[in-house]
Amino acid sequence: MGQGSSKHADSKLDSYPSFSRSDTQGSIKSLKSLKTVLGKGKDSNHDRRTSTDTTHSRHRYPETPPSLPPPPSPGILATSPAVLQKHQQEDSGNSSQSPTSPHPSNQPAMLSPSTAASQHHHHHSSSSSYAVSPTSPTSPTSSGPIGSNFDSASEHNGPVYPQDQQGPVIIPNSAISSTDPDDPETVVSLNVDEMIQRLIHVGYSRKSSKSVCLKNAEITSICMAVREIFLSQPTLLELTPPVKIVGDVHGQYSDLIRLFEMCGFPPSSNYLFLGDYVDRGKQSLETILLLFLYKIRYPENFFLLRGNHECANITRVYGFYDECKRRCNIKIWKTFINTFNCLPIASVVAGKIFCVHGGLSPSLSHMDDIREIPRPTDVPDYGLLNDLLWSDPADTENDWEDNERGVSFVFNKNVIRQFLAKHDFDLICRAHMVVEDGYEFFNDRTLCTVFSAPNYCGEFDNWGAVMSVNSELLCSFELIKPLDQAAIRRELKKSKRSGMAIYQSPPAEQVTQSV
């Protein structure tokens, strides 16, 4: 970007609503109350354990990366051709068998709904998960798999990536189309597995480096490749469980590695991330690059939604722009922004759980409204897309009121009830707000906020959480303990699941089911 472009971006930024308050909740309501509540409770959390306490066999980090394992088949995108073909061939009367977990020690203990309800308020127990049953015990009654009526989803316009390939996945530069006339670097071939290994090695390293372990040309090629995948899949993803749902991570790369340690590195688990990958944290580049590479490697089992921070104006203010400028160059930031503009917006899991970064919108009448959002697109100052990324639930008298963030609205319990009833959903799962325990229910467990960045910004002693949805639509939570950077480095150094164990992690034995 030249100097003129920079001035244009600055003038556009000036016209955007004020973000003087913290935009990752709570505006005043949550963040300030957290400081008072959490400041006196550091020691009370020591008895709460996380799944990262589980021991595994130790391996040295390999000098030559073996290939990553193939993903579970057919993937969890219900509109993927593999899923549709599978269910066209199956007898509708066949029932699925209950699978066993490849890592039983990492699976959260499932509680009955009544037990979970009684334990939800006792967060200082030794268990790292609290199961709830917000969704219907039976699958939605439909004649075919979810999304089977969405014809465009089966038209894959991007390159076909070899999911079942046993050897290293190499994407030649000829398969990566460049549609941006301002491409910062020449597109190069991608050795996806080797790049993933490089990034994970950085995550386990005790030293932080100013430089990025990937070259600018490699970063550009990653963005180009993943952008094609985003555009080849629907704006509204329709997924089948099991899946793990992750909230904000905000460039806290070491905590992202801890999250994968706890929940399983891909493809041992299916993932849906709810956005806000960059800004605030010190390693936004490593964070977003690892997520993009996993999306390229496992396109039908690893999904990323757009958050309000995946936007040019916000990244200019909250750190990602400065990190790109300092560690790469401004053109790399522009390439990321062009990729962010292609991210999907929302997801429906098993036809019952509506997932989005922010919340609801008064402009949202039908799910087709989301499907018809054009991409690539910037985030507008108001309207449907802005609300989906920015709105918050609140105890207000009116259905819709102005948001104290200065952007979008807040919506009350009545709006939630009407939305769920109209679309036959049971739960809204969203992120966008820091909460003390990593997850927090609202309105009789019809809405859940998930936040996955523990010790947020190094200032709040909050836990991180991941919501797991199993094939029976039972939801549970795995918690990430808040640690400072020194403690995180010590934990990762002692980790029993680094090195080759990552690459030998088997695919999920829970075969994804259409509902």
Swiss-Prot record:
Listed cofactors? Mn(2+)
Q: Where is the composition biased (Pro residues)?
A: 63-74
Q: Which residues bind Mn(2+) 1?
A: 248, 250, 276
Residues where Phosphoserine is found: 18, 505, 514
Binding positions for Mn(2+) 2? 276, 308, 357, 432
Question: Tell me, what is an example of a GO biological process annotation in this record?
Answer: signal transduction
Q: Where is this region: Disordered?
A: 1-186
The record's listing under InterPro entries reads: Calcineurin-like_PHP_ApaH (IPR004843), Metallo-depent_PP-like (IPR029052), PP1_catalytic_subunit (IPR050341), PPPtase_PPZ/Ppq1 (IPR011159), Ser/Thr-sp_prot-phosphatase (IPR006186), STPPase_N (IPR031675)
Subcellular location, in the record's words? Cytoplasm
- SUPFAM superfamilies assigned: Metallo-dependent phosphatases
Q: Active site annotated at which positions?
A: 309
User: What's the top EC group for this one?
Assistant: hydrolase
GO terms for CC?
A: cytoplasm; endoplasmic reticulum; fungal-type vacuole; nucleus
Catalysed conversion reaction: O-phospho-L-seryl-[protein] + H2O = L-seryl-[protein] + phosphate; O-phospho-L-threonyl-[protein] + H2O = L-threonyl-[protein] + phosphate
Cofactor detail note = Binds 2 manganese ions per subunit.
Locate the compositionally biased regions of type Low complexity. Answer: 126-143
Q: Locations of Basic and acidic residues compositional bias?
A: 40-51
Entry-linked Pfam families: Metallophos (PF00149), STPPase_N (PF16891)
GO MF, any single term: protein serine/threonine phosphatase activity
Name of the protein this chain belongs to: Serine/threonine-protein phosphatase PP-Z
In its UniProt entry, the species of origin is given as Schizosaccharomyces pombe (strain 972 / ATCC 24843)
